[in-house]
């Protein structure tokens, strides 16, 4: 565009609009993101100031005017840390979408303390009326995301006991979201080319000291564009026992990638036995990034641990592992490009402006979509019929084919979610139905929690997925009558129940990862590796439990059962010290080529 034309356009716009900044103003100060070290969460003040003045999103004309000023003249808007930056450059330290402030600038997360069934019912009704986003729930609390201007309406629908029993968990949601996005500095994996990325798995057996190198891939949350090349690279370097497969196709046509890891007999003359397989998946809910990183971390640990750790080597000789980092690639990609808190898949529904089906409510066993059928805009929308969500249907088809065609026996299924630090076993749809092997499920669940506690001192609760948010805090008599968690978030039609019941996977679990609510779905990147380590240790404990031939056959009272189980236990106990010194060093520190 000619200079005179640009100048004319600029003067015309300048004369028609007041000279105010497009950056939201608050208390006579321009809105600025805090320094990277500052946290946006706050748990100190007991009551959120509901009526205080809030930041205003600039008008469309103002944003257009400022954009033209910057694009034509490249003018700086303010000085930060001695360096001039334009509005567009303010977010260059992060991959956060430009619409972040407009979408979540007025939102907060409140935690309500729940003591009675009546309070639960009141909160459920109010949440449904106002279409609120229930983030999570536990024994005696519920976290809800909402706009500041909706808080008075919510409190007005609640009994007096709840009106004063809430605290602000996240005061500045937009800032906390901003901090969760990967940093875009030159050393970040997402900013490096395929030939320069320093996250390639090391095939070296050298024992590098932890402080000498850092595992760059797990130092941040990685988008799909980085995750997929990383998976291909991992397989190319460990092709003897790792394979990249697709377990289906998404609504938008993407593959659902998975890593199959295991060591098969090399004697072709020997008929291969039925292959026992463990599935570990994550990312069913797109915004739960930590589940994607954790599945990737466990997969990397098993793949690189083969031949180095006797425990991992034994497990990969006994089982195949199928790691599915994200069963919802479309939604996961959307959280990076557009909306960090998107939950569902990206499938079209009967309402064009409300796409998406909740993948973990779309499975065929005990599907119940009646509660959300009329509202595709619901975060828990389960579709109009079972398996309407394409990704759930595709994975179910893959699983059935593995059993009927490929001679696979699924022995365990672990579905990673966030948050609240819970280990859940079937059933989720109803507490009236008890699993046939309840005692074994509880025993292994307790073992997983113990392994986590020994690794990181973090406590994970073990319970049935149907247990209510107030059940465990009330007496046993009241627990059976307590309002179930499905009142706040339906657990019918889950992958957990489907794999257990329809696929006869005797050891099925849903694990809700860190934390207990300080950050919710926006867990800081610094907790990726610690979370990965503790769940990796839990998966090793699961393998140790399942490797005994008497566990899966159910013959726990055979003449040699106790003796053989003890032999397996002794072998794994001898390996623990070696694992901690060798494999953990590789997992958390060295991934550079």
Curated annotation (Swiss-Prot):
Pfam families per record: Peptidase_M14
Named cofactor requirement(s): Zn(2+)
Cofactor comment: Binds 1 zinc ion per subunit.
Source organism of this protein record: Arthroderma gypseum (strain ATCC MYA-4604 / CBS 118893) (Microsporum gypseum)
Disulfide-linked positions: 354-377
Family statement drawn from the similarity comment of this UniProt entry: Belongs to the peptidase M14 family.
Signal sequence extent: 1-22
Binding site for substrate: 285-288, 343, 360-361, 418-419
Keywords: Cell wall biogenesis/degradation, Disulfide bond, Glycoprotein, Metal-binding, Secreted, Signal, Vacuole, Zinc
Protein name, UniProt field: Inactive metallocarboxypeptidase ECM14
Listed GO CC annotations: extracellular region; vacuole
Bias kind Acidic residues: ranges: 566-581
Record carries keyword Glycoprotein: yes
Primary gene name: ECM14
Residue ranges of the propeptide: 23-184
Positions of glycan attachment: 370
Described function: Inactive carboxypeptidase that may play a role in cell wall organization and biogenesis.
One GO-annotated biological process of the protein: proteolysis
The keyword Oxidoreductase is assigned to this record: no
Peptidase M14 domain sequence ranges: 220-546
Region feature Disordered, mapped onto this chain: 180-210, 557-593
Domain of life of the native organism: Eukaryota
Record's compositionally biased regions (Polar residues): 182-210
Cellular localization per UniProt: Vacuole; Secreted
UniProt-annotated binding residues for Zn(2+): 285, 288, 417
Any GO molecular function: zinc ion binding
């Amino acid at each position: 565009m000619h200079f005179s034309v640009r100048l004319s356009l600029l003067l015309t716009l300048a004369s028609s609009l007041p000279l105010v900044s497009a950056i939201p103003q608050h208390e006579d100060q321009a809105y600025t993101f805090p320094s990277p070290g500052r946290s946006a969460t706050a748990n100190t003040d007991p009551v959120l100031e509901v009526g205080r003045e809030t930041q205003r999103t600039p008008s469309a004309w103002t944003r257009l005017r400022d954009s033209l000023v910057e694009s034509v003249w490249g003018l700086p808007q303010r000085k930060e840390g001695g360096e001039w930056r334009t509005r567009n450059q303010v977010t260059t330290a992060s991959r956060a979408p430009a619409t972040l402030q407009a979408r979540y600038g007025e939102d907060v997360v409140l935690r309500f303390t729940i003591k009675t069934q009546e309070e639960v019912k009141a909160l459920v009704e109010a949440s449904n009326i106002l279409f609120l986003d229930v983030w999570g729930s536990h024994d005696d609390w519920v976290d809800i995301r909402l706009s500041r201007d909706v808080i008075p309406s919510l409190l007005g629908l609640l009994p007096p006991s709840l009106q004063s029993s809430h605290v602000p968990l996240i005061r500045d949601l937009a800032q906390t979201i901003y901090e969760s996005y990967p940093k875009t500095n030159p050393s970040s994996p997402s900013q490096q080319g395929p030939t320069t990325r320093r996250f390639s798995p090391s095939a070296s057996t050298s024992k590098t000291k932890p402080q000498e190198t850092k595992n760059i891939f797990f130092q941040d949350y990685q988008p799909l564009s980085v995750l997929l090349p990383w998976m291909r690279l991992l397989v190319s370097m460990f092709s003897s026992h790792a394979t990249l497969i697709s377990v289906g196709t998404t609504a938008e046509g993407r593959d659902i990638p998975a890593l199959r890891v295991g060591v098969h007999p090399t004697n072709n003359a020997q008929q291969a036995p039925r292959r026992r397989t463990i599935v570990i998946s994550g990312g069913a809910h797109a915004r739960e990034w930590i589940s994607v990183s954790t599945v990737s971390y466990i997969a990397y640990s098993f793949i690189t641990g083969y031949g180095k750790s006797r425990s991992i080597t034994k497990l990969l000789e006994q089982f195949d592992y199928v790691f599915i980092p994200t069963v919802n690639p479309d939604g996961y990609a959307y959280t990076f490009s557009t909306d960090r808190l998107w939950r569902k898949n990206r499938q079209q529904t009967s309402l064009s402006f409300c796409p998406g089906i909740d993948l973990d409510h779309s499975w065929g066993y005990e599907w119940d979509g009646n509660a959300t059928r009329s509202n595709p805009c619901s975060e828990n929308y389960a579709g109009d019929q079972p398996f309407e969500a394409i990704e759930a249907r595709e994975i179910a088809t893959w699983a059935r084919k593995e059993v009927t065609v490929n001679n696979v026996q699924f022995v365990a299924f672990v579905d990673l979610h966030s948050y609240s630090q819970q280990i859940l076993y079937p059933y989720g749809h109803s507490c009236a139905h008890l699993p046939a092997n309840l005692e074994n499920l509880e025993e292994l669940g307790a073992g997983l929690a113990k392994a986590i506690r020994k690794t990181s001192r973090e406590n994970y609760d073990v319970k049935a997925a149907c247990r209510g948010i107030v059940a465990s805090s009330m007496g046993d008599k009241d627990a059976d009558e307590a309002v179930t968690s499905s009142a706040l978030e339906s657990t019918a039609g889950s992958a957990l129940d489907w794999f257990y019941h329809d696929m006869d996977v005797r050891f099925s679990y849903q694990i809700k990862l860190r934390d207990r609510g300080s950050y919710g779905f926006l867990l800081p990147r610094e907790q990726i590796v610690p979370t990965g380590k503790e769940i990796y240790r839990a998966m090793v404990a699961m393998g140790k439990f399942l490797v005994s031939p008497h566990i899966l056959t159910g013959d726990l009272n055979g003449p040699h059962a106790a003796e053989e189980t003890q032999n397996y236990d002794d072998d794994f106990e001898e390996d623990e010290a070696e694992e901690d010194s060798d494999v953990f060093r590789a997992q958390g520190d060295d991934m550079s080529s």
